[in-house]
């Protein structure tokens, strides 16, 4: 009996030891790729959960904050050795390298270094894949990436094993390669890996050398990792037909300038012209788009027909080409109205709708969806059709806290869709669209925006706010509503709100008087 108990205790001890070792390995992973500070051995459960959520977001996984099976499997996959979170990103919250990490020249040279001790990757393989990657990247911007025989080319690619001198970053068994930002430009390929000479990785264990080289060249050009699995800058070499996404192209052009192309210019002009026509002829919208007045900074206390969204514990208010931030209790104006491009670089305007989806902000402009984390776009813009909505634009979007976690709904006309949380909000639920009259028959006609306050949906029509009461069996308008939007603005002087509220009351009084006169006569 004693022997049996002794054996059980030994097994339990080994299992606990194995579990601790696994956790240590996963902590080292998070430290290696920038999610945790190296050397921090006293981690709180909250900081570890936050690090896991950030890692999961960059890996395209559900952000559980837990070391679940899918997360562990992703950590075990071959990947690039470059950190996912740079030091400058920790301080600035940016997802891409800042502009100083780029080449200033229009002609960027590269060289292929003799492999030396390599037994798997030949110099010809490196030259061929570098030429292919350089040609592809060069097509995206006003820059030429060319092989050169000069003594010190700007980029240098070589292959090596665990300790590859003079690099101080050691390869491990799961690292395919790593590279360094300008003006270092070094690209190192792990010679221990058996690479396939294909254009993309077709299956696990057959990593494409070209895919890896194209990715590492992106780092050598100044770009960080992207959470978009379709992007060339996705950190994990997953079997897929990767491509240069719209965000990859946008970043390349923003760093190195766009190529002058008559065809592209004509196409862009045609798109702009069509967009102008679309916006001018939309008569079924619930709000009027301003044109000449867009350049005038709006009065935050007298705004009309804005788009309001709750994001990161505060409210964003969009109006034409402007945006400002308000505290979650509506009492403080955090920043006054600034151009949208100043707060969200690259975001077009005016916007149609906005909603928080997980940790991201989704902004709808025409048929495009811009996904923002912090104040920067995290991947290429989506189209409405990408998530299963075949419309040219949407009217409004909101989070509904009737569910836990909150559900995300998108409206257009008399139909609405729900994002499918099982698909990580990448598609709408296949049971939709549905008619708004099914559950929302009491919503007033002509609403143009929606936001969440005190976990209840608030709908905007003009300057009127309708609070929907989800605690009742029938979703109707809460008692005491509608109210003027300005009644929420605790940051405005009292006389500003009085003027606006009295204007609304005055209009209601006139309307009531006319109604009474009609009934009398």
Curated annotation (Swiss-Prot):
GO terms for biological process: basement membrane disassembly; proteolysis. Residues 259-298 are annotated as: Disordered. Its cofactor is Zn(2+). Expressed in the anchor cell. Expressed in the anchor cell throughout the L3 and the early L4 stage, but not in vulva precursor cells P6.p, P6.px, or P6.pxx. Expression in P6.pxxx cells begins in late-L4 stage. During L4 lethargus, expressed in all four vulE cells, but not in vulF cells. The expression in vulE cells persists in adulthood. In males, expressed in the linker cell (LC) from the early L4 stage until LC death during the L4-to-adult molt. It is a single-pass type I membrane protein. Residues 261-298 have a biased composition (Basic and acidic residues). Residues 96-500 are extracellular. CDD domains: HX (cd00094), ZnMc_MMP (cd04278). Its main location: membrane. Its EC number is 3.4.24.-. It is found in: Cell membrane; Basolateral cell membrane. Glycans are attached at residues 199, 469. It comes from the Eukaryota. It is an enzyme of class 3 (hydrolase). The keyword Signal applies. Zn(2+) binds at residues 80, 215, 219, 225. Residues 1-21 form the signal peptide. Hemopexin repeats lie at residues 300-347, 391-443, 444-492. Residues 22-95 form a propeptide. Disruption phenotype: No defect in anchor cell invasion. In 7 percent of cdh-3 and zmp-1 double mutants and in 25 percent of cdh-3, him-4 and zmp-1 triple mutants, anchor cell invasion is delayed. Keywords: Cell membrane, Cleavage on pair of basic residues, Glycoprotein, Hydrolase, Membrane, Metal-binding, Metalloprotease, Protease, Repeat, Signal, Transmembrane, Transmembrane helix, Zinc, Zymogen. Belongs to the peptidase M10A family. The conserved cysteine present in the cysteine-switch motif binds the catalytic zinc ion, thus inhibiting the enzyme. The dissociation of the cysteine from the zinc ion upon the activation-peptide release activates the enzyme. This is Matrix metalloproteinase-A. The gene is zmp-1.
């Amino acid at each position: 009996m004693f022997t049996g108990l002794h054996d059980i205790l030994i097994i339990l001890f080994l299992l606990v030891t194995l579990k601790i070792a696994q956790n240590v390995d996963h902590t080292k992973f998070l430290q290696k790729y920038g999610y945790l500070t190296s050397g921090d051995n006293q981690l709180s459960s909250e900081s570890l959960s936050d690090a896991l959520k950030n890692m999961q977001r960059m890996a395209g996984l559900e952000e559980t904050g837990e070391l679940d099976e899918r997360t562990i499997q992703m950590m075990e996959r071959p990947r690039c050795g470059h950190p996912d979170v740079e030091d400058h990103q920790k301080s600035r919250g940016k997802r891409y390298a800042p502009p100083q990490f780029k080449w200033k020249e229009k002609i960027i040279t590269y060289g292929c270094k003799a492999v030396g001790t390599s037994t798997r990757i030949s110099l010809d393989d490196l030259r061929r894949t570098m030429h292919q990657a350089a040609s592809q990247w060069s097509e995206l911007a006003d820059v030429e990436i060319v092989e050169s025989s000069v003594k010190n080319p700007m980029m240098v690619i070589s292959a090596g094993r665990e300790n590859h001198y003079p690099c101080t970053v050691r390869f491990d068994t799961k690292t395919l390669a790593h590279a360094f930002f300008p003006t270092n430009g070094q690209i190192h390929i792990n010679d221990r890996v058996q690479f396939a000479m294909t254009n993309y990785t077709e299956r696990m264990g057959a990593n494409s050398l070209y895919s890896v080289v194209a990715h590492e060249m992106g780092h050598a050009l100044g770009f960080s990792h992207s959470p978009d699995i379709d992007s060339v800058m996705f950190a994990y070499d997953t079997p897929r037909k990767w491509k240069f996404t719209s965000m990859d192209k946008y970043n390349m052009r923003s760093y190195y300038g766009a190529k002058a192309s008559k065809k592209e210019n004509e196409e862009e002009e045609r798109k702009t012209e069509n967009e102008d026509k679309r916006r001018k002829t939309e008569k079924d919208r619930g709000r009027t788009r301003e044109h000449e007045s867009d350049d005038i900074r709006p009065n935050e206390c007298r705004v009309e027909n804005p788009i309001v969204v709750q994001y990161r514990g505060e409210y964003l208010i969009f109006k034409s080409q402007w945006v400002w931030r308000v505290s979650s209790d509506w009492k403080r104006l955090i920043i006054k109205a600034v151009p949208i491009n100043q707060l969200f670089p690259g975001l077009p305007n005016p916007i149609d709708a906005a909603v928080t989806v997980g940790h991201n902000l989704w902004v709808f402009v025409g048929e495009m969806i811009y996904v923002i984390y912090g104040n920067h776009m995290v991947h290429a813009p989506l189209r409405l059709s990408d998530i299963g909505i075949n419309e040219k634009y949407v009217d409004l979007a909101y989070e509904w806290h009737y569910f836990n976690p909150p559900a995300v709904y998108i409206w257009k006309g008399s139909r609405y869709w729900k994002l499918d949380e099982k698909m990580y909000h990448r598609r709408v639920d296949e049971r939709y669209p549905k008619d708004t009259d099914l559950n929302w028959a009491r919503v007033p006609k002509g609403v143009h925006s929606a936001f969440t306050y005190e976990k209840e949906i608030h709908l905007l029509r003009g300057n009127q706010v309708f609070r929907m009461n989800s605690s009742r069996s029938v979703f109707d308008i809460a008692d005491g509503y509608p109210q003027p939007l300005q009644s929420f603005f605790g940051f405005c002087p009292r006389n500003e709100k009085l003027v606006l509220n009295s204007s609304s009351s005055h209009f209601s009084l006139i309307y009531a008087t006319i109604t009474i006169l009609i009934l009398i006569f």
